[in-house]
Amino acid sequence: MLPRLSFNNVSWTLLYYLFIFQVRGEDSQKAVPSTRTSCPMGSKAYRSYCYTLVTTLKSWFQADLACQKRPSGHLVSILSGGEASFVSSLVTGRVNNNQDIWIWLHDPTMGQQPNGGGWEWSNSDVLNYLNWDGDPSSTVNRGNCGSLTATSEFLKWGDHHCDVELPFVCKFKQ
């Protein structure tokens, strides 16, 4: 036969467990780091990265070197539609509307892969998100370095010869 529990014993037992769970809940909340990213002045945060627009015109290689002066910095790689919209909002209205913007996309095969299959992010991020402004392999004067096209409000990708000088967006950790 089970011992008979009084109302008083049950109440104290419940209070004890509520107290233990409350204390554990507070401790676990303190251990979780903040997901907010603080970026330097002139830069804006998206997820865990900072982004900055540089309006100084540079070649693709020189632009990436300039971005590397920031912590883990490089030209921007755009991995989702949400990130594309964010970068578009960062750039729109801040550069000459006829100028494209360098991004970290390039074709190391120099156009040898059919259907634009040689394009990749320079850090080897998987190219799952595609947003070409037309087929990059079909243009007569195609380049091997990627850009955001001004005609698409900086949402779609284009290609240029890598020595063309354009403004650019850097993506970096803070």
Curated annotation (Swiss-Prot):
GO terms for molecular function: metal ion binding; oligosaccharide binding; peptidoglycan binding; signaling receptor activity. Zn(2+) binds at H106, E120. Residues 1-25 form the signal peptide. It is found in: Secreted. It comes from Rattus norvegicus. Transmembrane segments: none annotated. Residues 46-171 form the C-type lectin domain. Its main location: secreted. GO terms for cellular component: extracellular space. InterPro entries: C-type_lectin-like (IPR001304), C-type_lectin-like/link_sf (IPR016186), C-type_lectin/snaclec_domain (IPR050111), C-type_lectin_CS (IPR018378), CTDL_fold (IPR016187). Residues 102-117 are annotated as: Sufficient to activate EXTL3. Bactericidal C-type lectin. The lack of the EPN motif may explain its inability to bind peptidoglycan. Acts as a hormone in response to different stimuli like anti-inflammatory signals, such as IL17A, or gut microbiome. Secreted by different cell types to activate its receptor EXTL3 and induce cell specific signaling pathways. Induced by IL17A in keratinocytes, regulates keratinocyte proliferation and differentiation after skin injury via activation of EXTL3-PI3K-AKT signaling pathway. In parallel, inhibits skin inflammation through the inhibition of inflammatory cytokines such as IL6 and TNF. In pancreas, is able to permealize beta-cells membrane and stimulate their proliferation. Low expression found in healthy pancreas. The keyword Kinase does not apply. It holds the Pfam family Lectin_C. Residues 26-36 form a propeptide. Proteolytic processing by trypsin removes an inhibitory N-terminal propeptide and is essential for peptidoglycan binding and antibacterial activity. This is Regenerating islet-derived protein 3-alpha. Lacks the EPN motif and the presence of Gln instead of Glu at amino-acid position 114 may explain its inability to bind peptidoglycan. It is linked to Overexpressed during the acute phase of pancreatitis. Induction: Appears in pancreatic juice after induction of pancreatic inflammation.
